[in-house]
């Protein structure tokens, strides 16, 4: 009626791109050892634990002030942190917040050491999208600042995705909230209650 004779159905390039990234995910022996509790170089007799791993991606201090105290108080999970800013002074700040845990840094550790660690800090760029493969729950930083970072890179691995309140302008985050795959937190109490629920699932 309006003169259109040919129509192409085009997908969302954001989703197409993140699926391509997933398919090209890097194998990270250090992250694998961190999750399983055993390095590939170790004897097959060493038991695999398959620890629960919480991946914090592109986090900022307001995010870390919520999730780090929780993991200081709760056992049974391992914490993998990839900050948005990896300046040395910022990494030292994180180290000062972590209490009673064995912490290793990605560029300074081995799979054997990572297998024994409680916290793995990523102190280099280019690994985040591949890291989510080794997690069970993801936290996306920025929600207490200018806005959350990429939620799709985590969601594509079929894990719960947690983020702060500044998410209203992000279509992907809104979709996750509506589908039940995303969770907004505003306070430590929100986070603690949510994690307790996820731990019991």
Language model region names:
Residues 1-201:
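Nucleotide-activated sugar donor-binding and catalytic core shared by glycosyltransferases
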